């Protein structure tokens, strides 16, 4: 069976390590990137089955801008995006920005950090299996 590929883009090394371990233990092929620049290079070269994206990295809008660019790309727009954030109420703020400009950005799922391993695996399965 072909292992599903997941790319995680987050500027928190401990989150990358923990999340990777959870997913690899469930037989997913995982790669990580600590910046949107590195993430874009891996996204284009590897074409993962799922992207886990921190919405707020080095700058406030880095994750949102990354998702926006991805959704505007013909080649990358079909890859599911799971947004993750440690910011309280980030989901509400994200939803407001999506509601305003629904035509050009969307994520397939949102999860708040800290991530519950069982919830993460459940949501990953919903998106790619």
Each model region followed by its residue ranges:
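Non-catalytic signal-transmission and effector/linker regions of two-component phosphorelay proteins
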Residues: 1-5, 112, 116-129
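Two-component/phosphorelay signaling modules centered on CheY-like receiver
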Residues: 13-31
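Acidic catalytic/metal-coordinating carboxylates
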Residues: 14, 34-38, 61-68
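Acidic, metal-coordinating helix/loop segments flanking the phosphotransfer/catalytic sites
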Residues: 32-50
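Short amphipathic alpha-helix used as the core "switch/output" element in two-component signaling
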Residues: 41, 64-77, 99
């Amino acid at each position: 069976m072909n292992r599903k590929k997941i790319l995680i883009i987050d500027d928190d090394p401990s989150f990358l390590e923990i999340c990777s371990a959870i997913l690899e233990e469930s037989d997913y092929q995982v790669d990580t990137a600590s910046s949107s620049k590195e993430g874009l290079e891996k996204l284009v070269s590897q074409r993962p089955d799922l992207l886990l994206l921190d919405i707020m990295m080095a700058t406030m809008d880095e994750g949102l801008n990354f998702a926006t660019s991805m959704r505007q790309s013909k080649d990358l727009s079909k890859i599911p995006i799971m947004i993750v954030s440690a910011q309280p109420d980030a989901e509400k703020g994200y939803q407001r920005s999506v509601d305003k400009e629904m035509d050009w950005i969307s994520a397939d799922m949102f999860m708040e950090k800290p991530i519950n391993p069982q919830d993460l695996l459940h949501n990953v399965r919903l998106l790619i299996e």
